[in-house]
Amino acid sequence: MSLKLKITAITPYPVWVGIRNQFLLKIETDQGIVGWGESGLSGREKAVAGAIEHYTKFLIGQDAMQIGRIWQEMYRSQYFEGGRVLQAAISAIDIALHDIKGKALGVPVYELLGGKQRDVVPAFASTGDAAGEGAVERAHELRAMGFDAIRFFPIGQDSRDIFEPRQSIAATARILNRAREELGSEVVLGIDYHHRLSVAEAASFCNKLDKGVLDFLEEPIRDETPEAYESLRTMTDIPFAIGEEFSSKWQFIPYIERGIHQFNRLDVCNVGGLTEAMKVAGWSEAHYVDLMPHNPLGPICTAATVHFAAAVPNFAWLETRAPETALGFDNSEFFPVQPKLEGAVYPVSDAPGLGVEVNEALLAKQSFKFWEAPHLKRTDGSVTNW
């Protein structure tokens, strides 16, 4: 006998939690089972809320258990399909539907994705706001906490106004060379340049590093043109970590099939939810690309990604913050039950659904605050990437 749960309400909560807004979504059903999702398009929450309003018009009354069909209807039932705003909305809805289905069947979400392939999910941590020589000291602290994969940020990353790439790459290369010398060869070291470099600047940066210093270089340049990454690929043998901004399996095609990147940074809250993430994971597995999911948001995103990571074979590390409370996104007053690090790993929850509890009454009291990412300029006054 089939189990049907009719969608009765969809409520977005774009609210301030920690240092930024979180876009949370609640879906209710006629049998009292609710699900929670999260969108990853930080800074454009109002746009996502508008898309959710459009989808709500035809989702009310549908069977929440038919996740794949609903995904296809949201994506295909319009002429101007896809794009980051719509996919961020689809992601939140898709994650919430998985939460509902898991609760309805009494199983954790990973069971809906094929079952658990690992008991714990290894994580990598970042040096955070620590700058310059302080980043190396922070890396030592992370090692002492048990992390064997550590990500650095470039010199100038924390600037709110000026970022000069050429100045950054020289100083950052010196710091990374020192870090490798002090930390040894066992630890995995990477850096996220947040697509702030040109091909020439990225190549120059790689050439300033000693051999074997970096295990991955994340988002050195913008991703709109795969051929640009192919050009950079010929200039360095450092593995690339790319994909946190991608909003569909189609956007991953050239990167996976041309062997451009070695670590796939997909974001379940941007790519189209767990439904789309599993398709990207399979494609990546076929081309021996490891998964290294983007996870910069709140506990809903973390929980969904932990279930995803548990269910796929080709997994490397999950992004985390150490300590998790650093930015306030995991505020336990809002999320009394949520994934928690144990050392440098996330245990995989066996609770039905995502395994997250949300204090909706407190959430409803919070307001939305407009937040804008820094608008960076070079020293000559020209605009550059954040």
Regions found by a protein language model. Give the residues of each.
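Flexible C-terminal active-site loop/helix
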Residues: S2-I19, D30, I93, P299-W386
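Conserved, mostly hydrophobic/aromatic
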Residues: I7, G32, Y55, I93, ...
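Shared catalytic-loop signature of beta/alpha-barrel
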Residues: I27, G50-K57, R69, V213, ...
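Metal- or metallocofactor-binding catalytic centers and their adjacent structured scaffolds
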Residues: D30-L105, W386
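A cross-domain feature marking catalytic cores of carbohydrate-active enzymes
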Residues: S39, A125-D129, F152-P154, I191-H195, ...
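Glycine-rich, aromatic-flanked loop segments that form ligand/cofactor-binding clefts
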Residues: D94-A130, G134
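Metal-dependent enolase-superfamily TIM-barrel catalytic cores that perform enediolate-based chemistry
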Residues: V120-T236
